[in-house]
A protein has these predicted regions:
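Active-site cofactor/cluster-binding pocket
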Residues: 2-236, 240-242
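Thiamine diphosphate
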Residues: 21-103, 240, 247-353, 365-371
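Hydrophobic transmembrane signal anchors and adjacent membrane-proximal interface regions, especially
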Residues: 126, 234, 245, 274, ...
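Active-site oxyanion-binding pockets that recognize sulfate/phosphate
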Residues: 181, 362-366
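Flexible glycine/proline-enriched surface loops and loop-helix/loop-strand junctions
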Residues: 357-361
Length: 372
């Protein structure tokens, strides 16, 4: 690895090397468009046949605050959080100190060296690599927003070189991701190549920590819990969904609608054989579900803790009237409004003793997407 790179900065090459068994953490700014790039990175590893999982750590705001995305690569299929970070991509200068401290001994930190911070980002047991993502994108793209967005794809390109990712898989995923917006494919491909070519030219690639093709994901799909729950509703015969948007459950109904558009239409006429209603509040949503089940339909509603509280009266009605309603509670943290972008298991007793009087509800606790 060259220590004389013009723009790249390399310090203390100590990468111990972990093939198909490491954690990548990406430090970004919320609202900077990094979600698509991070998802693309994870899907690339999956398409290369290696078990992988992702975890988002993000604030309850629209943009501006720090956000992190963690990807665990595990050839053995261990997909829970491991507690270590082997490769850190630090794209937020506000969190440099924290990001550097999280890297495991022998790990690697990659940062945007458009503004060199080699003195700030220094640790004897960590390899620090600087790549000028902002400068590369500023020189290539003219629109300000495009420059911000393409920085994310540029670091995916650099990681493709550094981690030995299959570039053809990356390109295929870009084409799939932006199939409905073909005008964006070219710019994203350019950004990938910017990052890849810079890393390949200035550093020894791949790193000792890298991805090698396996065949352990054959016959598998990549899916999160909310999407899996929505797919389960389709397989279970649900035709009615009523809801009121609330984080972190909103994507359940988004996914259910998407699946219904594919699998709940009359094959001859194209008519929809499903009903999805956005109610005025959670109490109305559960009321619509009860009305649907009373008329013989299989119906459900997704919600979170505050919504579950509002549904208590009608949950008692469902018990008393023997209506088989399904409530999917995607839990957040805390009482009252709580923390919508954090998770815990604080709703268990509320779900078990929902409504007043003597009632009993069947409670199911999925431990993984397959059980959803």
């Amino acid at each position: 690895m060259s220590n004389s790179a013009k723009d790249g900065i390399v310090a203390n090459r100590v990468n111990a090397g972990r093939v198909n068994d490491f954690v990548i953490k990406l430090a970004n700014v919320n609202g900077s468009g990094s979600a698509s790039a991070n998802s693309l990175l994870m899907k690339t590893v999956f398409r290369m046949g290696v078990p992988v999982t992702g975890k988002n750590f993000f604030p309850s705001n629209i943009q501006g605050l720090p956000t992190w995305y963690e990807i665990r690569v595990s050839k053995e299929g261990y997909l829970a959080r491991s507690g270590r970070v082997d490769v850190m991509v630090a794209m937020n200068s506000q969190t440099y100190a924290r990001d550097l401290a999280e890297v495991a001994p022998g790990g690697t930190l990659i940062y945007d060296s458009s503004w060199p911070r080699d003195r700030l980002l220094a640790r004897a047991d960590v390899t620090v690599i600087g790549i000028p993502f902002a400068r590369l994108c500023n020189e290539r793209f003219s629109k300000a927003r495009t420059r911000v967005l393409m920085k994310n794809m540029a670091y995916v390109g650099s990681l493709a070189a550094l981690l030995d990712l299959d570039l053809e898989v990356v390109k295929t995923l870009i084409e799939e991701t932006f199939a409905r917006k073909p005008a964006l494919i070219g710019a994203n491909m350019e950004a990938i190549e910017l990052g890849r070519s810079y890393a390949a030219e200035h550093f020894d690639c791949p790193l000792p920590t890298r991805v090698a093709r396996l065949d352990k994901t054959a016959g598998c799909i990549m899916i999160d819990g909310n999407t899996a729950a929505a797919l389960g509703c389709v397989y279970a015969g649900a035709t009615v969904g009523a809801w009121y948007p609330i984080t972190p459950s909103t994507s359940v109904m988004d996914a259910f609608k998407s699946f219904c558009e594919r699998y709940r239409k009359d094959p001859e006429t194209g008519e929809r054989r499903f009903c999805i209603v956005q109610a005025e509040d959670e109490l109305a949503a559960i009321g619509m579900v009860l009305g649907a089940t009373w008329n013989g339909a299989r119906a459900f509603t997704p919600t979170s803790g505050p919504g579950l509280s509002l549904m208590n009266e009608f949950l008692g009605l469902a018990y008393y009237a023997e209506l088989p309603a399904v409530v999917i509670d995607v839990q957040r943290v805390g009482p009252s409004t709580g923390m919508p972008t954090r998770t815990q298991q604080g709703d268990l007793l509320a779900a078990a003793y929902a409504s007043h009087g003597d009632t009993r509800h069947v409670l199911l606790f999925p431990a993984n997407p397959r059980e959803c």
